[in-house]
Amino acid sequence: MKKSTLQRGVVVLAATGLAITSAMSAFAASGDTAGAIKILQKHKFLQLAEGVGLAKAPASNKLADGSTFKVAKSITDKIAKGEQLNFAMSYGAKGIPLFSQQYFAGETKGIEAAKRILPMKLRDTSPEGNSQDVQKQIAGIEALLNTGQIDCLSIQPLDDHSFTGITQKVMAKGIPVFTVGVESAGNELSNFTQVSHKEGLQAAAIVIDWMAKNKKSLKVFAVSGGDPSATWAQGRMKGFVEGITKGVPGAKFLNTEANGLATTYDSAKTLDAYKAYIAGHPTVEFIENVDIGAEYAARAIADAGLKGKVFTIGWNLSVGQLDAIDAGTQVAALDQGWAQQAAFGPVACAMYLKFGTVMANNQALEPVTKVTGTATARKLLASILS
C-alpha cells in the first residue's frame, strides 16, 4: 500500500539532536510514564503500554523529505511553564458507524494517559458525516493551525499520500505530527498501523488454516469493502487474493482488488450490497470484507439460507461480527485496534515533547476466532465504548 517506512524516528529535536531545549529537558523530569502505562493497561491498550517503554530518541536528524525539524518556541515555552498543550486529532469523520465511536473513545482515553506525562487538552477537528472526506479533514486542521490552536497533531489519513502536504506544512511550523491507522509517506515523526498487504496475507493464512481444520473445500472467493479504492483496502484485498491463490489449489476469484465489491460504510446499504451480490453470484463460497462490514455479509448469508455453505472474514470489532463468529459464518475478525490507534497520538505527543523520544510502531493485528473465543473481545469492546 505504500513505500515509506512505518516507524520513522527521523527527526532532530533541537540543535543538539538529543534534547528539544534545555528548559524542556529540565521540565521533563516530572513526567509520570508509569502512571500513563497503568492507565493504558486499564483500558487494555497493551500495545501502546508496551510502546511507551520502547520509545527512544530518533536515530537520524533527517525527515522523510530531507529537512530537519525543531519544535516551535511557543510550544517549548508552554512546556517550560507547565501550561496545557493543544493536542489536535483528525480522523475520517465523526459519523462512520462503529469506527467513529471507537476512535472517539480511544482519543479520549489516550488524553487521559497522556496527561500523566504532560498537561494537554483534546481538540478533535474531525469532520461531520459518515464517510471520509480528505478536503474536509484538511480544512479542519488548517482552521486550528491558522488560529494557533495546535501544539501537536495526529492524523488518521485516507491513504498514503493525501495528507503529505498538510503534514509537511504543520511540521514546517515546528509542530510535531504523527499518523495512525494507515501507512503514510509524509514527514510525520512516527506511524502506528500495520502493512495492509501483509494483513491480507495474514487473513488468507487464517482462512486456509480454518479450512484445513474444519475440512472445508472452498474454491470460489470474492473481495469487498466500504471503499475498495482506498490504498489500505487495495493492499488487504491484493494480499488475500495472493495468499488464497497460492495456498488453495484451484481457487477462483470472482473479483480482485481491481474490481472489489463496494459496499459503502452505511449499514443498510452494506447489507443490501451483500444480498444483491450473493443473489447474483450463486457460486460464491467465501467473501472477504476489508473493514467493518463482514457482519452484514454474514447476515446476508443467513438471510439467503446459505449458513454453513458461504463464509466471510473481516476487520475490526463489532458485536455483529462477534455474533457471526460464534454462529460459525465468520471465520475471524482481525482487530487492528481502532481505539489504540486513536490513543497513540496524544501519548506519542506527550512522550516526544516531554522526553524527546519517538514511540515505535509496534501495532499488530489481533485475530478473534471461534477457537480463541469472543468473550474477551466482547469485554474489550464494551470497555472501549463505555
Predicted stretch roles:
Residues A139-A172, F240, A258-A324:
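Hydrophobic alpha-helical
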Residues S67, V71-S74, Q137, N191-V220, ...:
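Hydrophobic alpha-helical segments within soluble ligand-binding/sensing domains
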Residues F87-M89, A93-P97, Q101, E107-E112, ...:
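An alpha-beta-alpha
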Residues A19-F27:
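C-terminal segment of classical bacterial N-terminal signal peptides
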Residues T33-L40, F45-L46, N61-A80, Q84-G110, ...:
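Extracytoplasmic "Venus flytrap"
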Residues K2-V12:
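Bacterial N-terminal signal peptides that target proteins for export
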Residues D160-K198, S318-V331:
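Flexible loop/hinge segments that line or gate small-molecule binding clefts
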Residues A29-L85, I244, G337-S386:
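Hinge/cleft segment of the Venus flytrap/periplasmic-binding protein
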